[in-house]
């Protein structure tokens, strides 16, 4: 451990210990990240471009027909003020459409921070980098559902 003779020394030690977020880009200039939500897992690649978003080989508006799901997917891009600056390619599997949209959103957020580490603070504040850990509660025996009991008859 470093020798701490004053509070000023403490600041230099803590700065050195904090991990610096480094730009992670492959040989093709893309950043890769995985996003998860419920049972859906998305693999996302982000690269500079015109703003085209492709999900499982289809245009994102075609894959996610509901406007709410399209809005969920675009949230991190709009929050980072990078609308129309990145091409996004995602493959997503598992779960339903809502979980898949959340998984792609999580993956896009992580990939944006890998590509441009300066966006991390904005996306973290918006809650886009946090994995939403809520999943369906399992059904218990002796119950109709996870918590709902069978109908009770007094007589």
UniProtKB/Swiss-Prot annotation:
Keywords: Ribonucleoprotein, Ribosomal protein. This is Small ribosomal subunit protein uS9. GO terms for molecular function: RNA binding; structural constituent of ribosome. NCBIfam families: PRK00132.1. InterPro entries: Ribosomal_Su5_D2-typ_SF, Ribosomal_uS9, Ribosomal_uS9_bac/plastid, Ribosomal_uS9_CS, Ribsml_uS5_D2-typ_fold_subgr. Coiled coil: none annotated. The gene is rpsI. It comes from Rhizobium johnstonii (strain DSM 114642 / LMG 32736 / 3841) (Rhizobium leguminosarum bv. viciae). GO terms for biological process: translation. It comes from the Bacteria. One of its GO terms (cellular component) is cytosolic small ribosomal subunit.
């Amino acid at each position: 451990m470093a020798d701490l003779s004053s509070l000023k020394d403490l600041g230099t030690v803590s700065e050195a210990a904090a991990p610096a977020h480094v730009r992670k880009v492959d040989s093709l200039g893309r950043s890769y990240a995985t996003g998860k939500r419920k049972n859906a897992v998305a693999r996302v690649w982000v690269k500079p471009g015109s703003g085209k978003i492709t999900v499982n080989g289809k245009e994102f508006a075609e894959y996610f027909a509901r406007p709410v799901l399209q809005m969920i997917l675009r949230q991190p891009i709009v929050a980072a003020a990078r609308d129309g600056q990145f091409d996004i390619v995602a493959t997503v599997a598992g779960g339903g459409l809502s979980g898949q949209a959340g998984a792609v959103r999580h993956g896009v957020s992580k990939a944006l921070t890998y590509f441009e580490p300066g966006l991390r603070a904005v996306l973290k504040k918006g809650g886009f980098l946090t994995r939403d850990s809520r999943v369906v509660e399992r059904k218990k025996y002796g119950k109709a559902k996870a918590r709902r009991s069978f109908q009770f008859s007094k007589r």
